[in-house]
Structures are given as C-alpha cells and as structure tokens.
Amino acid sequence: MKQPNINLAACILWLLSIITAVAAETDAERNTGVFARNSAARNRSPGNEPPGYATRFKGVTWDVANWRLTTTELDQGHYQSRGSVANGYLGINVAAVGPFFELDIPVSGDVINGWPVFSRRQTFATISDFYSFQRSINATNFPWLDKYGGDLISGVPHWSGLILDLGDGNFLDATVKNSTISNFSSTLDMKGGILTWQYTWSPEKHNGTYDIFYQLVAHKLHVNQALVRLEITPSRDGNVSVVNVIDGYSAVRTDFKGSGQDGSAIYTSVNPEGISNVTAFIYAELSGTEGVDLSSSSLVDDKPYIHMNGSTIAQSVNVKLRAGQTTKIDKFVGAASTDGFKNPRQAAKEASARALRTGYEESLKSHIAEWATVFPSDSTEDYTIPGKKWLPLDHHIIEASIVSVVNPYYLLQSTVSNNALAAVKNAPLNRGSIAVGGLTSDSYGGLVFWDADIWMQPGLVVAFPEASQIFSNYRVDKYGQALRNAQTQHLSSKNDTYFSPDAAVYPWTSGRFANCTATGPCFDYQYHLNGDIGMQIVNNWVTTGDTEHFKSKLFPVYNSIATFFSQLVEKNGTKWTVTNMTDPDEYANLVDGGGYTMPLIATTLKYANQFREMFGIGANQTWNEIAQNVQVSRDQASQITLEYTTMNGSTQVKQADIVLNTFPLHYTEDYTHDNALRDLDYYAAKQSPNGPAMTYAIFSIVANEVSPSGCSAYTYGQYSFSPYVRAPFFQFSEQLMDDWSINGGTHPAYPFLTGNGGANQVAVFGYLGLRLIPDGILHLNPNLPPQIPHLRYRTFYWHGWPLEASANYTQTTIQRATNRRPLTSADPKYASAPITVHVGPANNITVYSLPPSGQLVIPNRQIGSISTVPGNLVQCQPVFSPNEFAPGQFPISAVDGAASTKWQPRRASSTSSLTVTLPDHASSATISGFAFDWAQAPPVSAKVVLHDEPLHPVTDPENGDASGSSPTTPASSVTVWESAKVPLSDPYDPIKIDLNMIMSYKGNTTNVTLPSTVPATKFATLLIRGNQALGPVEVRAGNGTGATVAEWSIVRSS
C-alpha cells in the first residue's frame, strides 16, 4: 500500500489547464447552435442568473435553480411528449395538452407498445401492485409454461380529466386542434412534483378566447390523494360546463365492479382480471370559485369526450364566466385498492373528502413540502460553478445537469416516503419494487425485472436509502415463493438436480405472485437475476448500516440464493459451470458457462460465507471451493473473456454483459484491469445499436476505472442518456430510435426507468469511483473528466452516515454531511471514529482516514491529461460539428483518447466537418503530423485545415443542420493535409479474415508526417466525405451513413 503524495507541479498544470479551458470555451461556444440559443446567458453576473438554459430540443428550456423543464412546443398524440405524475402509490400519464386521457396517433402506421402485451399505446393510470392474473399472455419466453398463467399490471380508470365544454361541439380535451392553441407552455416542476399547462384556446367558429391553466399533482404525503386545478380566463362572458371525467379506457385488464354518485362525489371501481378479491376505487369531487354552480352537478354520458366503458363515469357542473376574470375549478381525487387497504372504498372516499376539506392551496403546500423532504437540493449532482450557480455554457453539461435531476425524480415517483407511510399507519405501500415503466406505463406488462435490482437501485440507494427499501422489501416479500420455486425444477433441464428446501430462485419477471411463468421462467434462463438481487441486498446494508435488518430479513434471502447457486452448478473437469442458461446478453440463449453469471455465482458464494461467519453460522467449505473454481472462459489468443463457452467472433451483443464483471460486480479473481480494458474495448465494438438504454452507463463507469488515458468515460456518460432521452421532459426511451421498423423490431418501453437508473450511476460510481463493498471500508477512486470544471456530488450514505463530496479536475474533497442527520440505522461505531478510506485498485491501494469532522482531500487520477497518442495536442479538447451524426456517435468521441468511441456523421454523400479547439498552451507549439483511427469505416476522402478564425457560421439545429453545405473557409486558413482516397491499413478481405475468430480491436489507421512542421492555430478542422465500408448499392443511392472517426490526434513536434 502506498501513502498519498500531492504533486505541486501537477496542481499548477491543472490550474493552467482550467484557465486554458475557460479561454477556449468562449471560442467553442461560438460554434454551436445550442450555445447560440443560450446567448442571453453570456451576460451573467451575481444575482443575474439566467431563467432557463436552452436545450437541443426545440422550445425546451431548463431552469437549473428550480429544477423545472418547460416546453413551448405542443406535440399531441405521441407517447414521447406526454408528462406523468406519481407518488409511489398512484401514477398517471396524461396528454401533452392537459390532464386528459389520450390515444396515440399512428406513426408510420404503428401505435403498439412492446413485449409481452403488444397493446395499443395510450395514456395509463394505475395503483401500486394492482396486478391481474392472465391465463395466457401475448408473448412469452418459454411458451410451454403458459399453462401456469402469469400476471400483468392492470390499469385503473383515468382520473384526472377536467373538460371545458362550451356546447355546440366545442370542448377542450386531448383531441383539441393544435391550430386553436397559442402561447402554449407546459412545465414539469421537479422540486414540487407538479405538472402544469398554460395556453390560450381560441375555439373554431366561436367568438372568444380562453386563457387556460391546468395543474396536476399526485400528493406525495397523502398518497391516496391527487389534485387537479383548472383556471379559465375568458375574453367574453358566457355560460359553459366543466365535466369531471373518470375515463375507464385506461382501466386495461380489469373487470368493472361498480360506479355511481356518493353524495357530491362520483366514484368507480374495478377488479384486476382474474383477481376477484382485490378492488380499486376512484373517488372524485369538485370545488370552485364564484360562478361555479356545484348544485347543478349531474351525471353525463352522451358527450364525445366520454369513452363508453363500463368503468367510465362523468359529472358536469355549470359555470358562469366573466370576461377578464379567472374562474377556478378544483378536482380532489381519492384512490385505494385492497392490496393496501382493508376497506379501499372508504379509504378512497375519505381521501377525496379530506383533500376537499383541506382545500387546494393547503393540500398543494403539504405536497410540495413533502417533495422537499424526500428530494432535497443536495441529493443530486450539481454542475454549477461554485458561488455563482451558473452552468458552464456547454450543452453536454447542461444536459448532464438535467438528467442528474430527472433520473432520481422519475425513480422517486415510484417510491413512498416514510412520512407518507406514517400517514397511512404503515399500510404495506412500499413493497412493490419498481417496474420498467414505473407507475405511469404498462410497458413490459408493468413487471419487475433485474432492471430494478441492478440498474435502478444502486444509484438511488446511495442517496435515498429509506425510499430504496422498496427494492429489498419486494424480494423479501416474495422470498417464500422463491423457496417454492426452487422445487419446480422438474419443469426444466434440471429435473434430476436436487435443491434443498432452503434454496431460493426468483423468476425473470414477477408481479403479484413471483412464481415461475412463461414470461418469467426460473430455470434454464437468466439465473444471474438471483445474484443481482444479492448485490442489491449488499448495497442496502452498506448504505444503511442496518445490520439487524440485514441479519433478520435480508441475509436469509442471500443465503438461500447462495444455496441455490451451490446446487445449480455442475462439475466440468476441475471447474464448476452452469449449463443451459442465458447471460444478460439475450441474443445468446440456452448457452453454457455465462461469462457474467459464473463470476457472479462465485462472488455470491464468497460473500455468503463472509456473512455466515459474521453471524456465527460458519462458512460452507464447498461454497469456497466452488467460488475459487468457477469456469470463466477466455479466448487464449486475444485474452477476451467469453460470454459463453462456444462464443465466436460473429457475436453481436444486446446489452452490457461481460463488462458487468468490473462494475457492479467488482470481480478481481484472475481478472485484472488489463482484462477489463480488453473486454470493454472488444464488447463496445460488438454492442448492437438496437440494445436497450442502460449499457453505456456501465461502459462509462468501467472506462473511468480501467482506462489508462483519455476521457472516454465522459463520452460514454453522454451516450448513457443523450440518444435516449426525449422531448420535452427528458424521459428515457428504451431504444436509440423509436421506429420499430428500423430499430430491429422493438416497440420501445416508455418511459424506460432502467435507462434513468443506469445514467443515475455514472457520476457517483464512475467519476467518484464509489464501490459498495461489504468490508467496513469506504472505497473511492476519483477521476473527474477534464470537460467538467467542477462537480458537487449527491450526498451519499455509507453505513447510515451521510457524506458529501465535491471535485475539480485535480482533487476531490469529502467530509461528513453538515446538513443531514445520520439514519436511525447508522452504525454507531462511526459516530466518533474515523472512516477508513481506500483509494485506487485492489493491487495499488492508498489508505486514508476520514475524520468525524473536517475534510479529506484526495488527488484525482487525471487520466484525461495522459495522452493515448504521445504528443497529442487535442485530446479531450472542445469540438464542434455542424453536421447531424448517427445516434450516440458524438463529435467528442473523436478526441477522447479511446478508439472504442466514434464520431460518425449521418450522411456519407456530403462533406462533414469536425472542428477542435486547440488549448492556449499550444499557441507557441508546432505540429508535426496527425494520427487517425478510422475504425472499420474509413472515409473516401479527408483533409485537415488549420485556422485562427471559426470555419463555420453558427448553425442552429432548430433550423436544420449544415449537411451537404460547403464550409466557409477564412482567407487565413491553411490546408495542411489532404487525401483524395484514404488508404486502408487493415482492409477487409473475406478470404483471409475469419469472422468467427475473436480478435482484439484493430482499426484502420492513417499516420501523417508533414513535410515540415507548421505553427499551431486556434482551431483545426477535419473534413471527410464518403464511407469505404458502404456497398455499391448504398453508394449509388447516396443514402449510407458517414465514415467513422474513432480518434484524431494532432501531434506536437518534439
């Protein structure tokens, strides 16, 4: 072990680099449309913070101080543009124009949601755990298990509709004509958990206009309640109706129970299909200001906006409007189901009535206060400049700031707070885990996958350990069924394998029952889920420090999973393996010796013995022997870890698999950083563009840990969210492209909280290098990419103690959080004792001590300053391209020091350009040449231009990109290299190349040595055209994607 050594020279160099970056940033800003739209933010001064930062999405701005996303673009009938609210118990998805039910408008003839239901896309509402029982499901993994049935989430009637009806066929609902809406804006307020709309409605053939304001909340403290407000300000007097609609169209997979009036309220009720002893009730009641005649209330059913469904009910009231005066109508919703309340009708009725008595403003106030408690300002990463609260004018950082808030926000919407539980006398409301689409979508049937345990939980539990109990509570609740599942091996290839009564196995998908089903088999499929649950359990203990809970509730589950694994494995020579299984890469099913599953089994058995000894049970020596001898296959020539024993080089990978061994598994048994780096580079090249939105978060974290140079972790970090988020509210889609006809046939899940969960891990586990290892040591390995000037990390918990950390490029400062109390479960031994901190890889640890008070300063690794290509002047420097690029193939990829990331323009048929800003310290340097790595798709032609003035005018993405245009060239620019036909260093030869061979990454490269050195300039631009990887047909049609640039280095003369 080495002791820390602060290098003064390195600190001075860092300071110079920051000054350089700030100076260079001004030039880089001039060359991007997003920066151009943020031009008003340039004139910043203390107390003059900009109200909002423009994003790349037209009309969408980000208010970083108040955590608000606002859009002025109205996009109706498309699932991507709809907002949602949820509180952990109730969830609802609503139309883009207001809190209405909405059916999707077909896009390219498609309105279908994905596997396994393949139902029509529309707005959705549900209640936590409201699962149905289905005799069969439209699509499955193992159809022969269909005879045992399965469960899918059921909807509840869509409860938020308030329709303004003018009569004569003029009404305001989701189908209102876009042309009648002006001054539109809609805002998602994530500090308050509020969704609002504001616009002017000018109905056709109607002499008058109406200023409209809608507001929607699902109460975070009183989770049986929801609130809707409608404000109407007319241009003329008039009599109208406002209709309180509870729309049964969203109550999918339910049986109608009953509906009607109950006093001044209306209600409806449904059972989930196949579950007759569970009922959900929805109550709704109105109040209003002067002009709202509540005594006129009557049921209506003959309106075009009232869908004819058994569980639909609507109530109309007369409203007298006065010109220029605002009339308010408030809707108070109560909801409950048998799963959480013994008398759901009474619970729903009382919730609605209580909200009405409390009043809208007071109810809203308590809701906002609870969100502030649940989601404090220090619980997300803060990218603002210290002391100024400004974001750097860099669109990458602006979007990173947005997702640092939306990621935990969307996950927290599916959790119930401790205060909320207390308010319902600890009803069992926080035990359902989080489905792929949360509570606002029935994507993936509303089922729970590994997504919850390994993608959503880790980044959430470190900052919100109490809310995150929902993950472990679910697995504990289903533990009894998991024990029974292990005894169903006779339905699988393991029919001759003995599993003891204390062995437990969880199904791949689960809902109400967690039994083995056709969508969620327990055997012959993704056994790794069980080890993922084990990791989730360890994360829970390391963050909360609740050893008693761990011992009594969580360890029994962990021990039973270990027992199952120990009986599942088979001896193969001297090694242990698992046959007929699937690793996380679902493109390879029913294989042997999964390259992630086997290390996961070894780690689970190792930790299980550690915990057994800790609790006085004694280690199982057979488990130790298995753990030390699991089969992990590796190609001998390339040293690439294989996903399965028969894998060959033709493999294309669906999602993160082998790279999971480095993180989150932290597997190091005969697995070095060199192995991890080889695997990362290899599998990054094998990653399918049609894979789901979470893989690149792991790539970022692993790259930050094992890369010896460059800043590819930053590139991968951008890739983890940028291509997947959608306007206006930065919700994740499962896919890079939503059109199933071009994305490999996937109807993407939306919202895809798995993507949020993955991206939510990048900063804390990547840049900070936090590892949740159950050894009583705080493990960190900080390395902040040079593109980020400063980062304050989320407050995170370790053994129940809140810690805060912040970083610049050279160092990270960590201390006990001064504004947070420890959890009640916090390990008391750290109350007055220091925390031991290990920094660095296991074979090169530096030991620190974090005192109970005071700070610990840790030097960052600063790998961005280590040149992959010696003498490279532009590694990790600001870049800009005016051209559209293939999804995720960012311009920054070309200079991040890693060949595994690539810039790829969208079109090969036109000239595309990439401009890099050279650092100020290069102003006196001379350039001797260039090094290019073109990966597998070199351009036909290329040239490099040096210049001191911007080569391109500002190009606004809102008005189209500059593809196909000829770049303007300043008179002072110099073309220093040009090739009309870029030579191939590694041309594809189908006779010599065996596609089945597993080979480490090798790209086509071009090394250029200039005839004589040339002075460095402020900018250098690479222009490329064509793509030598395209076939003749694509070239003639002119519709192929552009060439790839994996790395462009500008080499300084020695």
UniProtKB/Swiss-Prot annotation:
One term of GO molecular function: carbohydrate binding
E.C. code: 3.2.1.28
Binding site for substrate: W450, D451, K654, Q655
Glycosylation-annotated residues: 138, 178, 183, 207, 239, 277, 309, 495, 515, 572, 580, 620, 648, 808, 844, 1004, 1007, 1039
Signal peptide range in chain numbering: 1-24
Reaction it catalyzes: alpha,alpha-trehalose + H2O = alpha-D-glucose + beta-D-glucose
Gene Ontology annotations of biological process type: trehalose catabolic process
Cell location: Secreted; Secreted, Cell wall
Region (Disordered): 950-974
SUPFAM superfamilies found in the cross-reference section: Galactose mutarotase-like, Six-hairpin glycosidases
Low complexity composition bias: residue spans: 962-974
Principal subcellular localisation of the protein: secreted
Record InterPro entries: 6-hairpin_glycosidase_sf, 6hp_glycosidase-like_sf, Gal_mutarotase_sf_dom, Glyco_hydro_65_C, Glyco_hydro_65_M, Glyco_hydro_65_N, Glyco_hydro_65_N_sf
Residues at the catalytic site: E586 (proton donor)
GO CC, any one term: fungal-type cell wall
EC top class named in words: hydrolase
Keywords: Cell wall, Glycoprotein, Glycosidase, Hydrolase, Secreted, Signal, Virulence
Family: Belongs to the glycosyl hydrolase 65 family.
Function: Cell wall acid trehalase that catalyzes hydrolysis of the disaccharide trehalose and required for growth on trehalose as carbon source. Plays a role in virulence.
Protein name from the UniProt record: Cell wall acid trehalase ARB_03719
Taxonomic lineage of the native organism: Eukaryota, Fungi, Dikarya, Ascomycota, Pezizomycotina
